[in-house]
């Protein structure tokens, strides 16, 4: 016989994954202040394999408006600089031979709106994933009824699943509101 608790836990795991995905996606959307996580998505070629910049250099934020990158291998300066220029972050690195400095310019009103829109799109993707997890859970419960699960147990489990769903949707809304506030703050 199918365990209702397992079905709910599996759905909850899928919902957790959607929230973790959103956290990661929102971390890469710049909000006007310097953050080392801004560069996490940029990969560079290091001895034949693509690795994050943080694997080949020390990445720090000396102040709220700049990021410094100090490559451990001098040959990586050009590679890192090119990768940053080629990224869609809209930032220009300055290479002085010792460190690469990235000035984070203040965001324009238009760019802030674009970023807020991008956040909403990422949030919508996460919400769809959560709804799909709920749907999969409900489908598994309906199948369990055919395998001998009592209908009132199914209804109770669906109600629990809906509560879990609502909790995750609220968490996503909260994350989006926080990021939107961060982006729109001048």
Curated annotation (Swiss-Prot):
InterPro entries: Ribosome_recyc_fac, Ribosome_recyc_fac_dom, RRF_sf. It comes from the Bacteria. It is found in: Cytoplasm. Keywords: Cytoplasm, Protein biosynthesis. One of its GO terms (cellular component) is cytoplasm. GO terms for biological process: translational termination. Its main location: cytoplasm. GO terms for molecular function: ribosomal large subunit binding. HAMAP family: RRF. Belongs to the RRF family. Responsible for the release of ribosomes from messenger RNA at the termination of protein biosynthesis. May increase the efficiency of translation by recycling ribosomes from one round of translation to another. This is Ribosome-recycling factor. It comes from Bacteroides fragilis (strain ATCC 25285 / DSM 2151 / CCUG 4856 / JCM 11019 / LMG 10263 / NCTC 9343 / Onslow / VPI 2553 / EN-2).
